[in-house]
Amino acid sequence: MKKKLFLLIMSSLSFGSCSKKITPIDSISIRYNNHLYLNVNVKDKIHGNFIFDTGWNGVSLDSLFCNKNGLDYKTKDIKISGIGNSTRTAKLITDTIHFKFSEKEDRFSTSTAMLDLKSMVGKTIDGIAGIQTFAQKPYMIDYVSQKIIFINSVKGYESVNAQFEDYKIYLPLSIILKNGKKIQGKFMLDTGSDQTILNSNFFMSDGIHNATDKKKFFAKGGVGGDSNGYFLPVVAADLGKFKLKKLIMTVSTDTLGALANPNYMGIIGNDLLDDFNIIFDHQKEKIWLKPNKNFNRNKNKLFRSISFFDTGEKWIIAGIVENSEAYRKGIRMNDQIIEVNNVPVEKIDLDKFVEDLKANDSLHLRIKREDKKIELKLKLNVFIKS
């Protein structure tokens, strides 16, 4: 199970990220590891690691990143909600901030959110760059070569019936359940989520609530607090003219927040999006798709029944599948992992560790839970079949 970046929804506020100057450039390098990471300079000198998130309207900065780099701004308190069942207080920076996404791509923001991103998403994130970041001209996300490429041609691509509304992009998606029924409608295109998620309004649908092969999970939802739901094997999903087969969908059971919103059916995350090269044209309000070499390759790691959140000194259990071996062995949400296979976690690169995991790998975990220290051994068994 992979970590999930929250979707931020602001109350009575609209964030903007505007262009300072646009000089022709072919592409910008990104890093793709379930999320899209950008190298960003703040105020022309301070390097930051930002997530490119089309589910977010503006720009956000991590509060610790600001404090460590002496970024002192005028702020006011705001309320935000997101994936999960609660709201939090954050800061709205009212000063103008300049960002550089390459030597030739400058932006500025006049309304920037500042919040504790590292405690919600992980120690490596310094900020979020939202949907308007590159909206001034057509661009293509290439998940394979890990680039954002500015282009002038859509030759070889298929148009999808996209809807641009209130700084969000919606695409039609049809999900085919194992009982033959279809759930179809508009889903938000969200590069800030590593998962495609069906909103909780549809949990009671025939073929979902009564599916015998679904698996319940518990997860941290970022800004909105804990976010729970089920993993559900489905026959296929149709996106435009393209059919993606044998998928594991996520179905939310949240009662509040973005995943309980009745105005759209769910979100399309990177687990589906990374099967394609995707062209965005915000001026014409159009989206084009072309399958890449990952198309319909089963990338699901169906043994990852636990997910970790890296604080630096320890890993926090940020997600777990109920009745998986990890759960049966006693691992619980918010457990603090101190050592893995006799190696302190501060000496382990979490991303590489997770990427290298294989089915049936054995883990020896040293855990701190409140004032107790626990040792557990387990195998990463496959917990669900697509």
Where are these regions (language model features)?
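Bacterial Sec-dependent N-terminal signal peptides
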Residues: 1-27
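Pepsin/retropepsin-fold aspartyl endopeptidases
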Residues: 18-386
